[in-house]
């Protein structure tokens, strides 16, 4: 839920610590692993509730600061590869085609949905934590319906309004 609603990279989700979430202001604050840049994102209620439920009811009682922990064997922070495997397994159960079962697909979908909801490119850039607008291009696929809304009608000869 968190990855889909925040667009965070797997490496950033697994590095989140208990102190990364400000429950009062409903914000997630982190330093991005890939860029080293600080990032503050809104904590959506559904994500916040899921994280709180995990912390209170599913997370082992440990001094480890990371929110998400590996529960098999020795308790340790979850790594990006394991997080990706969990996401892939859930996507498979949901019927997502194999070629689309990737943690990063959640990030691309997040960017695309923002674009579909007419969020400015500058804000999308900030939310994805990109320094350069060009690095956003792979995330901003335009849906077929949105493309059809931009097209102009094409009239052929003999049709009303067309040339003869």
Residue ranges and their predicted role:
Residues 20-23, 100, 119-140, 145, ...:
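Short, polar N-cap/turn motifs at the start of nucleic acid-interacting alpha helices
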Residues 1, 5, 107-131:
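C-terminal catalytic core of tyrosine-transesterase DNA break-rejoin enzymes
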Residues 33-52, 65-88:
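C-terminal catalytic core of Y-nucleophile DNA break-rejoin enzymes
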Residues 6, 10-11, 15-49, 134:
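Conserved tyrosine-mediated DNA breakage-rejoining catalytic core shared by Y-recombinases
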Residues 1, 24-27, 50, 56, ...:
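Activation on folded, globular domain regions of eukaryotic proteins
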Residues 142-164:
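DNA/chromatin major-groove-contacting recognition/catalytic segments
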């Amino acid at each position: 839920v968190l990855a889909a609603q925040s667009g965070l990279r797997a490496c950033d989700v697994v590095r989140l610590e208990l102190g990364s979430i400000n429950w009062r202001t409903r914000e997630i604050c982190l330093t991005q692993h890939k860029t080293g840049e600080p990032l503050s994102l809104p904590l959506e209620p559904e994500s916040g509730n899921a994280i709180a439920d995990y912390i209170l009811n599913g997370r082992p009682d440990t001094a480890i600061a990371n929110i998400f922990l590996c529960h098999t064997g020795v308790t340790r922070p979850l790594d990006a590869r394991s997080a990706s495997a969990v996401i892939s397994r859930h996507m498979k159960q949901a019927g997502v085609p194999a070629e689309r079962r990737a943690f990063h697909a959640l990030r691309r979908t997040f960017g695309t949905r923002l674009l579909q909801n007419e969020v400015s490119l500058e804000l999308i850039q900030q939310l994805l934590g990109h320094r350069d607008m060009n690095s956003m291009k792979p995330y901003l696929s335009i849906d077929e319906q949105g493309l059809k809304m931009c097209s102009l009608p094409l009239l052929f000869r003999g049709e009303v309004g067309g040339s003869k």
